[in-house]
Amino acid sequence: MAKPDEIGFNPLEELDRSEARVVVRLEFRRFRKPVTTIQGLPSGRLAEIARELKRRFGAGGTIKGGEVLLQGDHRGHLKEELIKLGFSTDHIDMI
């Protein structure tokens, strides 16, 4: 898997640590399909982070309203992947 320096960014460099609050939650959309939503990611790198998470999970997804939406329930492994991307464990909330 790619390391943070291989994909060319460290999200915490762009944000103050007190403001780098990432919220992960599971929602059910059309036809009760699960969607994992991720809020609080740096907007300048949103597309790059979304692309990397979709690749790592082998899932479809999109960016909508400043959130990353991943098809399926990925809460079990998402925290580990966000930590690998450089986010602090203290600033990741799983709802």
Locations of the language-model features?
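A generic structural motif
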Residues: G66-Q71
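Long, charged, low-complexity intrinsically disordered regions
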Residues: M1-R51, R55-R56, T62-K64, G76, ...
